[in-house]
C-alpha cells in the first residue's frame, strides 16, 4: 500500500513538473530573443544603454513624460507606465523599461510588451491611451 502511494506521488510530481517547465521555459526564451532582436534592430549602436548618455535624463519611476504633448491624464500615464514596468520585471533589462517609454509609448517595444504580457485582448484600449497622451 505504501509503495503504491509513493509511486503515484512520484508520477504526479514528474508530470506536473514536466508540464510546468516546458511551457514557461519555451515562452520566456522565445520572448527574450524576440525582445533582444527588436531592441537591437532599432539602435545603430552595439551598446544597449547608449541612448542613456544623451542630453535628456531618463527616470524609471517618472509617470509623466514632458515630451508628450497630448492630454495630461495621470490615470492613463500610470496605466501605460505599468505595462513598461511589468515588461521590465519580465525581462529584467533596464533598457527595456526606458525604450518602452520612448516617443510617448508609441513604439514597437511597447507593442511587444503588450504581446508578451498577454494584453492583446485590450490592445485598442492601450492604443487609445497612447494616442491621447501623445497627440
Swiss-Prot record:
It is found in: Secreted. Disulfide bonds join 68-104, 84-100, 87-113. Residues 1-26 form the signal peptide. The modification Pyrrolidone carboxylic acid is found at residue 62. One of its GO terms (cellular component) is extracellular region. Coiled coil: none annotated. GO terms for molecular function: neuropeptide hormone activity. Keywords: Amidation, Carbohydrate metabolism, Cleavage on pair of basic residues, Disulfide bond, Glucose metabolism, Hormone, Neuropeptide, Pyrrolidone carboxylic acid, Secreted, Signal. Produced by the medulla terminalis X-organ in the eyestalks and transported to the sinus gland where they are stored and released. One of its GO terms (biological process) is circadian rhythm. The modification Valine amide is found at residue 133. This is Crustacean hyperglycemic hormones A*. The lineage of its organism: Eukaryota, Metazoa, Ecdysozoa, Arthropoda, Crustacea. The gene is CHHA*.
Amino acid at each position: 500500500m505504501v509503495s503504491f502511494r509513493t509511486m503515484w506521488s512520484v508520477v504526479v510530481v514528474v508530470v506536473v513538473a514536466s508540464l510546468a517547465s516546458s511551457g514557461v521555459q519555451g515562452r520566456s526564451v522565445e520572448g527574450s530573443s524576440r525582445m533582444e532582436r527588436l531592441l537591437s534592430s532599432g539602435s545603430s549602436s552595439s551598446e544597449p544603454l547608449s541612448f542613456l548618455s544623451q542630453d535628456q535624463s531618463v527616470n524609471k519611476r517618472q509617470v509623466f513624460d514632458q515630451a508628450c504633448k497630448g492630454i495630461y491624464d495621470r490615470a492613463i500615464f500610470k496605466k501605460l507606465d505599468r505595462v513598461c514596468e511589468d515588461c521590465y520585471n519580465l525581462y529584467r533589462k533596464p533598457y527595456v523599461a526606458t525604450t518602452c517609454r520612448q516617443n510617448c509609448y508609441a513604439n514597437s517595444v511597447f507593442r511587444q510588451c503588450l504581446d508578451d504580457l498577454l494584453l492583446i485582448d485590450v490592445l485598442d484600449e492601450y492604443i487609445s491611451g497612447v494616442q491621447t497622451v501623445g497627440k
